[in-house]
């Protein structure tokens, strides 16, 4: 029997009898003495045994390979090369679904990932490589792996699919990410640096550059921190796939890399101070436009900011919320902005605190915290009732303290008897009745009219909005599942006519949670041509669609925010093409027939018949509205249709069951008027009749107002442009006057013209100078945090305007320069906290990406969210890569940059061992009869196992198997869990080179 055969038999028996790592080490040592074998043949025998077994994942196999590496039988580079030879990463698309059951190979990716991660650990601890030659060999092996994964991506990429290529397989994503981390770790070792810095390995660097060029574009979708790390590596060593000119000063490059490591290690962190301005800015950012409130992200940020200091957390978030209200009053913010600020304080914070108390089981002296927070407020902004009669100024916030305290008492944070003591006078109201979500759901199910009563209370300041919204959204989800569209229509109508209620909804729910079931219902709407009455169906469809459109346009939501994941979605097609007319020859036979039927019904027959609607589903009708308008208006403009007939026909669209379609009609009409080179009199008359109808029913009037709210802003811009081209026209102003009350519908964080003019004409450098001036005033205010004084004027719209108009690449350097000056002036810790908060503050453009880091979507079911702009965090990461160069010219700036980078990472660090608390769920299911609820009363989504089909028994068995495997390898599996960030791993890899004491070896759980 030959050596490979003997070894193959040995490996087969070891796997069959589940021989642990220690015994395997001893047995393999004995066999090696009797039957020597080359390392390549040894690995071939082991991996061929795996192929023959056809087992998708065997935890012993990586342990055996690791054992062979530790005992010096095989080299790491040879392991990686042999692993690739037998990997199923080479499988073609038609074989990918079989995962080795029918093909020549078994599915190997889970084993591949584990072996590569073991290699990463070995590299990070300094165990590998020992020589430059081994480092070169590992680099070449990584290069081959990267090309193999890139090839897999190309062969599985389908431009028509949201999730294709590597994103179509979680295992390939994990393999891809592990390779990048391994490359970064190897490049940070002493031997890795020597290889990359030497001029004798140009061939390797050319190939490495080619591999990075293939890797980095794909990395954007997987991990931005990893992409930034490898991009910095590419720039430092000029790894672009081309040979470096001979004149390059390589020794200087080598010194720069060593200096980079030494400089960053030499930067000492100062004291961490949580400035008063920090949370003031953060809450302003959450609420200044579309409410960007995610409980998981907020808890994580607060936990990172305050650690276990719950008293400070409660006191400072309360103080900041009152400060935001005070600032809004002094800045004369709009009533809708003041309403959002107020609702966050009164409706959000009390149940948020109650849920936090219930979930942490920590005793917090709430009355003391509230008392301290109230003592720090400006008494002129929040006067008592006795003071308000003496004051001549604005007393709009005089009852806010009382509302908040009663909401706290309703949630059992404080006893009702404490309210008078905290107010310093007798309260002017009584304790409101506390609501429970489940009870409200039962009430609505028993009496659907109860839903509208509750929706009316969403805007009340009694601390009950969270329970109401939880109940309403749950009922809506149930109605969508049951297709009970009549009751759902009434709820949607009640919500869509109350824009401020939509704002409160987003304080407690993200848009996808509310809208995804509605969009799914609209997409799958069942249409039966024999169902009887059709007008009620159009009515129900239109009401549901109108609520989706109201959310979409009020908050400028993208399809991903609505929960739309399919390119075939009706809602997506309507949003993209609903206001675009089609040429007749582009319509299919059914569309032509439907168009003819609707034209006949509107302009020839005496009304819209059941026959017309039965032949055309609501989905088909909405997609034809723009074409219907186009053809009808063209007929009128060419004299084929009288204007009065045209006007009378279009007035049918003012009926409630068709009114939502007017959104797309008005949008098309505005575009048509704006594009016209001829006299626009006829379309302007039509527009006036639809915007300001002579008669409209009471029911339709509410829907019409919502329609105008949605369409008004775009129409106004188009009409003003037309008026500029035709200054003598008198038929435009009446339309603009009718649109005027609807222009403030959007809530997207955009700046007012007067604000922008003030900032951009700032005497000290325009918009950037005004941002720096605001920064200075916030730092100055924070130097005396206990003083009862009004906060400095601030709106996060200023920073948003800077990022949107100038770009983050210009805003961040200005912030860093100001931070540097404040550091020189002795205000470094305060300024550092403020700058870090500005960078961490949520933005609408990046919010879904940030949410995905806390609650990842399944890439197999929906597309991963994307960020459309370069953020302050992105620029900070890129600037951090240039610290070595900056330190040579401006050491203080480099130090400030390093500290800022660390502080931002600390504030945004993902939770490691803290469960992901679904605070909304806790809030809704808590009994308001007492704070001391047990854990059994709360539904905590601690692990998300249920969402992935893993039951408690399965999870326990998996953990036991991993623990056993780890114990066999002599490792501790208590690990940090799967929440460890890539930066943590990369930083550990950097620090561990020659410094094993910096590396946490308890990493088993990561893999």
Curated annotation (Swiss-Prot):
One of its GO terms (cellular component) is mediator complex. The keyword Transcription applies. It is found in: Nucleus. It holds the Pfam family Med5. Belongs to the Mediator complex subunit 5 family. Component of the Mediator complex, a coactivator involved in the regulated transcription of nearly all RNA polymerase II-dependent genes. Mediator functions as a bridge to convey information from gene-specific regulatory proteins to the basal RNA polymerase II transcription machinery. Mediator is recruited to promoters by direct interactions with regulatory proteins and serves as a scaffold for the assembly of a functional preinitiation complex with RNA polymerase II and the general transcription factors. Component of the Mediator complex. This is Mediator of RNA polymerase II transcription subunit 5. The gene is nut1.
